[in-house]
Amino acid sequence: PSWPMTFQFTPLSLHDIVLILPTRHRDDRGFFSETFRASAFERHVQRPFVQDNLARSAAGVLRGLHFQLAPRAQGKLIQVLRGEIWDVAVDIRRSSPTFRRWVGTPLSAETGHMLWVPPGFAHGYVVTSDGADVAYKVTAEHEPALDRGIRWDDPDLKIQWPKIGPIAPRDPIVS
């Protein structure tokens, strides 16, 4: 293709969390977009990706807040392939000036926006559409013995999850 392939990288309020807007080239057939190019990402992502994951979730499913301990702490590049989510990252780096602060942003297949969550953050999302397929690249392989989580409704964090309908005793479905 003769057009430039570009990405816009926008730091969010926790500036280590980066919203990535890929250029979409549209025509009467649909669109074409790069979703990753190592040379474009190297300023923002200093580690190679070693594993790709895909999660399919129904409406209202809340996944997270997950993280993995060192030496296998994971950075994640999150992209929605179908549907919409509201994505959250929580700074869990004890030495960070933003320790225990969180940021949330919508991601959807329609916009193609992606989110970079570096190692040292817990990550989670809630599905805000009829369902969602979420793909993410990670910088360390999954190690179940190092897997940890934080409650989605931790009273100290006060995460403002979007209201997605009435919550039954079993809801949201958390994983």
Stretch-by-stretch model annotation:
Residues 3-113, 129-131, 138-175:
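Non-catalytic, conserved peripheral segments adjacent to functional cores
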Residues 121-123:
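Recognition helices and adjacent regulatory flanks at domain boundaries
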Residues 126:
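A short local structural element in Rossmann-fold oxidoreductases
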